């Protein structure tokens, strides 16, 4: 991974990895589910200054002093999240440069928000898609972008680096990212 260690340090008081509430990805970027995104105590204790809601089904409670951004995308294979990769990555970066903190969330903090996080790490931390996924999964083990988002992330990685570190492969359950091939083989052999 090419990002500096300081940009990934945890703040004091944040335990990692956190599956059900906030997961700190970088010093200024967090992932969560929709319930945690509406928890005033969690937001204030983690000094969140911006919330990106990557869902159509979660309604945010608006708290003073927090900027809210809506990315109205469903968690479906044919949903177009790619168009939001650059604008949301740029926003997260701008907030970080101003010493702010961003919370990305969707319904469960598994697919849509995780995909936006991976795009940000590729663009602003020069991480390959594979490294971005490995890092983010180490911080939030439940991430699992849907296959349509994987295809879009693979295209985005190619746009950024003219190279791919993850590819879609054919499997008994359809096309999947090659990083899931080992897990699938283990499941099938059981």
Swiss-Prot record:
Entry's PROSITE patterns? TYR_PHOSPHATASE_1 (PS00383), TYR_PHOSPHATASE_2 (PS50056), TYR_PHOSPHATASE_DUAL (PS50054)
The record's section on InterPro entries has: Atypical_DUSP_subfamB, Dual-sp_phosphatase_cat-dom, Prot-tyrosine_phosphatase-like, Tyr_Pase_AS, Tyr_Pase_dom, TYR_PHOSPHATASE_DUAL_dom
Q: Which UniProt keywords apply?
A: Cell projection, Cilium, Cytoplasm, Cytoskeleton, Flagellum, Hydrolase, Membrane, Mitochondrion, Mitochondrion inner membrane, Nucleus, Protein phosphatase
State the tissue distribution.
Expressed in testis.
Q: Which GO terms describe its biological process?
A: flagellated sperm motility; peptidyl-tyrosine dephosphorylation
Segments carrying the region annotation (Sufficient for mitochondrial localization) are: 43-128
Q: Which residues form the active site?
A: 106
A single GO cellular-component term from the record reads: mitochondrial matrix
Return the Gene3D superfamilies for the record. Protein tyrosine phosphatase superfamily
- State the family named in the UniProt similarity comment for this chain: Belongs to the protein-tyrosine phosphatase family. Non-receptor class dual specificity subfamily.
| Assembly | Microtubule inner protein component of sperm flagellar doublet microtubules.
> What is the recorded name of this protein?
Dual specificity protein phosphatase 21
Which gene name does the record give?
Answer: DUSP21
């Amino acid at each position: 991974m090419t990002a500096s260690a300081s940009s990934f340090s945890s703040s004091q008081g944040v335990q990692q990895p956190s599956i059900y509430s906030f997961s700190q990805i970088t010093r200024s970027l967090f992932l969560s589910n929709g319930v945690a995104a509406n928890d005033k105590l969690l937001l204030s204790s983690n000094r969140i200054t911006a919330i990106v809601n990557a869902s159509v089904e979660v309604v945010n409670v608006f708290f003073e002093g927090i900027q809210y951004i809506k990315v109205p995308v469903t968690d479906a294979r044919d949903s177009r999240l790619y168009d939001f990769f650059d604008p949301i990555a740029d926003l997260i970066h701008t907030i970080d440069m101003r010493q702010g903190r961003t919370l990305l969330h969707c319904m469960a903090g598994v697919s849509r928000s995780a995909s936006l996080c991976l795009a940000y790490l590729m663009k602003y931390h020069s991480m390959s898609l594979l490294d971005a996924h490995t890092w983010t999964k180490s911080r939030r083990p439940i991430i699992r972008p849907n296959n349509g988002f994987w295809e879009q992330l693979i295209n985005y990685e190619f746009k950024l680096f003219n190279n791919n570190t993850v590819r879609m492969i054919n499997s008994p359950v359809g096309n999947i990212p090659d990083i899931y091939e080992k897990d699938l083989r283990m499941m099938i052999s059981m």
